[in-house]
């Protein structure tokens, strides 16, 4: 059973995410009132993790939350870097 607690911020050169995430169990369902999201397969996720942008984040719409994905309160501060756009290739 993998439990993830109190992830305050995750950032790299392409995507910056500031959020507060509570605890999630191995079934990827919220077990804390402060939980807003859970990860599918841990922080790395799939498709190379955060190096591939949104490919590394899973579980927002797949069984995260009670009653559907619309019940989750997701607070993401995304800085894509449009001012300084770079040609970065991954995967």
UniProtKB/Swiss-Prot annotation:
Similarity field? Belongs to the UPF0512 family.
Indicate what this protein is called per its UniProt record.
Answer: UPF0512 protein A
Taxonomic source organism: Dictyostelium discoideum
